[in-house]
Amino acid sequence: MTDATIRHDHKFALETLPVSLEDEMRKSYLDYAMSVIVGRALPDVRDGLKPVHRRVLYAMHELKNNWNAAYKKSARIVGDVIGKYHPHGDSAVYDTIVRMAQNFAMRYVLIDGQGNFGSVDGLAAAAMRYTEIRMAKISHEMLADIEEETVNFGPNYDGSEHEPLVLPTRFPTLLVNGSSGIAVGMATNIPPHNLTDTINACLRLLDEPKTEIDELIDIIQAPDFPTGATIYGLGGVREGYKTGRGRVVMRGKTHIEPIGKNGERERIVIDEIPYQVNKAKLVEKIGDLVREKTLEGISELRDESDKSGMRVVIELKRNENAEVVLNQLYKLTPLQDSFGINMVVLVDGQPRLLNLKQILSEFLRHRREVVTRRTLFRLKKARHEGHIAERKAVALSNIDEIIKLIKESPNAAEAKEKLLARPWASSLVEEMLTRSGLDLEMMRPEGLVANIGLKKQGYYLSEIQADAILRMSLRNLTGLDQKEIIESYKNLMGKIIDFVDILSKPERITQIIRDELEEIKTNYGDERRSEINPFGGDIADEDLIPQREMVVTLTHGGYIKTQPTTDYQAQRRGGRGKQAAATKDEDFIETLFVANTHDYLMCFTNLGKCHWIKVYKLPEGGRNSRGRPINNVIQLEEGEKVSAILAVREFPEDQYVFFATAQGMVKKVQLSAFKNVRAQGIKAIALKEGDYLVGAAQTGGADDIMLFSNLGKAIRFNEYWEKSGNDEAEDADIETEISDDLEDETADNENTLPSGKNGVRPSGRGSGGLRGMRLPADGKIVSLITFAPETEESGLQVLTATANGYGKRTPIADYSRKNKGGQGSIAINTGERNGDLVAATLVGETDDLMLITSGGVLIRTKVEQIRETGRAAAGVKLINLDEGETLVSLERVAEDESELSGASVISNVTEPEAEN
């Protein structure tokens, strides 16, 4: 090492400056972040493209790889792109080309590919040396007019080439094909849309720039995915359009086919899947769920997809509900998926979050700039051509002199000097201007010096004109046609007038944009692929539950369960029946009713509170199952028992819950008052000391009410109440003692029509009740029946049953309507043979009847096998009972279950235990 080298190194070391590592990292990271954001990850709001997409299309355009030309090898295009414009790996460029050619990834493909470009199953494309591509026809609309100085160009990475910084696209590519990308600290995810819908929104915004975003959303409505499927619910979509961030829920499109001659089995066929879902992985996921027994209703799974379309077949087991399995697939697999909207784009080189209207407005602003720049370019070109035409006119007017001048000049330079040095005769130029109706200034190209052109002395040629004359051959000079020159000049003048008019009138630019958008819509518009279900939403547990009629049983010890009604076949009267539930010693089933799995169970307790729960949430068990303690299903206080249960589907304002207590008190409350029940329950009725709730039923406000006592008596009255101006507030507490004596005097009088004066006034949940039936000391209400007055003509009858298993059916008409508060009349004999009355219900001739004993035995029998008798008759044997066993409940199973909507039975409810 020489001394000079040492001195040089020492000098270099002395010039080293200390730098803060923190500052350097911050600066370098920000530079890198902005490079990724602007140069790689985010699309430009104007043309909807990221740099790599733009460079691919421009390279194909430069190679004239047009839609109607021969295909070129993908490797050729990749080489041009990375060599001229995109200094990155070839795989990144080829992956971009592949995606732009996939009809399941792009709503409108921008590249026409030939060969294997991958599949919806996630299969990779063939290598670039095997595939061939060319531009799709619609891609030419993105590059239209690019040679007319419509967009800015910039140098490529090494300054050897120039590339467009944006494309002059004629349609809103950003929305039409969408975009996705992950930058540093931000990301974008924009779904594709239907071209027709998007252009219609642009046209609306062109006509009315102040159009509200809601109106634009009404036009576009939702994304339109290349794989079709169904947009499920519009709440998240609208949020995304309004704020730039939202969520699109997508469901695969399916249909259900029967299997077998009788259609005893079904299959689900998947025709379309959500956007960006891998079909092979979807099928694999379904198979895994079947193997794990998470999905138990599927017997076979196969993919029958081919070139004609998608077809994934899911065969179901016998008696499986296809709709329920389908909802399980939606919940557990990507057959239902979501697309997160995050519309972050580059606006003037800066990342911004835009809403739908802002994106459309930015596109239209871009189109306005493109049309303006294109018109300026064409005006400049027309003026230049006019300038050249004037050269021809001058040459024709002075042809002999010009030929002589050229011949006498020793070289071209001297000839040019002579042409520029003097004015020339300009009669033909003046004639052309006169015919066109334009002044000379409108024709002058920009930048032309003042002493050039038509002057008083004649016409002074420009250097461009002189060069053009010298380049003309003698044959061309002598062959100039005056008429042709004048006609050509006139056409140029017309174009110039038009271009100047366009530039001076913004409305003309707007019309040009409109016409071009209409043309795009006509040439490329199509129907939506994705259907829209505006009322969709997240899948609730209820969607996965089949609608079935269930027998709900509640034991005296508080065990509840459900069983399908199909578990029981009708038997002849007097049979032994099937075991409905295994009960513990000294426990028995006291309540039984039929409800749909999607019904709400309104559970009213002996303490006058209300709880509710969906039927499908109750434990389902076999005949040997006890069920689950009801206090594990709903929150009950110590000493609180469910004493009445009502099954309802909805909570309309014009319906009521009618209550009856053991001491004969009645009350009604609007059903809607119970639609929001707290976990610990809400108060339903205020009870007097020693009283407890017996029954509850849904009524329409003018139903007939029947109360049955354990002593075999019944009373029938109408609930209708006609409000008068003197009535107190409907939700005020009702004093039960005030009018009892007055009511008793008239209660047993005949009352054939509801008067509205002796009915039951609606009250609030916290109030008490009115006397419905007067009882002796040993009497208590055991059953409540409600029905519409016209039911009397329907053929339905009152069936009563006693503790010792006897019963009968009696026409409703045998029970005359009375005023409420009376002692009632005989319904069935309650002597030693029959025992106390335990339950009553309405039945039809073709119905079945379910009977339940204290031993847990259940029998289903035909009503027609039970003899019809009068009110005073003792009845017939309904069920054979073991010694010490009693009948505790019954339930009608209607031939048409819809008939049950007006009737309810809750029977044999026990008194609350006394506090110690």
UniProtKB/Swiss-Prot annotation:
Matching InterPro entries, A to Z? GyrA, GyrA/parC_rep, Gyrase/topoIV_suA_C, Topo_IIA-like_dom_sf, Topo_IIA_A/C_ab, Topo_IIA_A_a_sf, Topo_IIA_dom_A, Type_II_DNA_Topoisomerases
Gene this chain is encoded by = gyrA
The organism's lineage is: Bacteria, Pseudomonadati, Pseudomonadota, Betaproteobacteria, Neisseriales
Source domain of life is: Bacteria
User: Which molecular function GO terms apply here?
Assistant: ATP binding; DNA binding; DNA negative supercoiling activity
Q: What else is known?
A: Few gyrases are as efficient as E.coli at forming negative supercoils. Not all organisms have 2 type II topoisomerases; in organisms with a single type II topoisomerase this enzyme also has to decatenate newly replicated chromosomes.
Q: Name one Pfam family in it.
A: DNA_topoisoIV
Matches recorded under NCBIfam families: gyrA, PRK05560.1, PRK05561.1
Q: What is its EC number?
A: 5.6.2.2
Region span, Disordered = 739-774, 897-916
Q: Which organism does this record belong to?
A: Neisseria gonorrhoeae
Q: Which family does it belong to?
A: Belongs to the type II topoisomerase GyrA/ParC subunit family.
GO CC aspect terms: chromosome; cytoplasm; DNA topoisomerase type II (double strand cut, ATP-hydrolyzing) complex
Q: Which UniProt keywords apply?
A: ATP-binding, Cytoplasm, DNA-binding, Isomerase, Nucleotide-binding, Topoisomerase
Protein's name according to its UniProt entry:
DNA gyrase subunit A
Q: Which reaction does it catalyse?
A: ATP-dependent breakage, passage and rejoining of double-stranded DNA
Where are the compositionally biased (Acidic residues) regions?
Answer: 739-748
The Topo IIA-type catalytic domain is annotated at: 42-544
Q: Which GO terms describe its biological process?
A: DNA topological change; DNA-templated DNA replication
Free-text function comment from the UniProt entry: A type II topoisomerase that negatively supercoils closed circular double-stranded (ds) DNA in an ATP-dependent manner to modulate DNA topology and maintain chromosomes in an underwound state. Negative supercoiling favors strand separation, and DNA replication, transcription, recombination and repair, all of which involve strand separation. Also able to catalyze the interconversion of other topological isomers of dsDNA rings, including catenanes and knotted rings. Type II topoisomerases break and join 2 DNA strands simultaneously in an ATP-dependent manner.
Q: Where in the cell is it found?
A: Cytoplasm
Quaternary organization: Heterotetramer, composed of two GyrA and two GyrB chains. In the heterotetramer, GyrA contains the active site tyrosine that forms a transient covalent intermediate with DNA, while GyrB binds cofactors and catalyzes ATP hydrolysis.
Q: Which Gene3D superfamilies match?
A: 3.30.1360.40, DNA gyrase/topoisomerase IV, subunit A, C-terminal, Topoisomerase II, domain 5, Topoisomerase, domain 3
